[in-house]
């Protein structure tokens, strides 16, 4: 595992080579199963004539591959290390899928205001299961975890 950055200072880091091919396969299978059977919480965050941008939440207890990834991948251990915690609790899983060619961009946002959680030991994790070009990759603004917080919005323009 290669850690790039200072989580406490910046609120985000890049962790490289932490997810094995096997763990990535579990995540990919979980996402495919999720897309084949969306939950009632699922939303389409793109217009109908655009490539699909779909999000879904809270499926780990009904999709075995997702539960396996959450329980057995190093994700929880990484979160514990970054937040300097001896325990980790799952608030929710959140699957975001953008098909190639999707024109809908992901609006700038902060994750913390979406959560009903106080304190500094909160971590969101993002990792692609497919190659992502730099212009399409997630970007972070260092220090925004210290506030002010902005009201959450939908991703759809």
Describe every region a protein language model picked out.
Residues 18, 116-118, 137, 149-150:
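Active-site-proximal flexible loops/turns
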Residues 116-133:
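Short, conserved beta-strand element in jelly-roll/cupin
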Residues 94, 110, 127-131, 140-142:
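Short, structured patches in soluble enzyme cores that scaffold and shape functional sites
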Residues 17-19, 100, 129-133, 144-145:
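Short loop segments at secondary-structure junctions
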Residues 1-10, 15-108, 113-116:
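Non-heme Fe(II)-dependent double-stranded beta-helix
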Residues 72-76, 122, 156:
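A structural signal for well-ordered alpha-helical scaffolds and beta->alpha junctions
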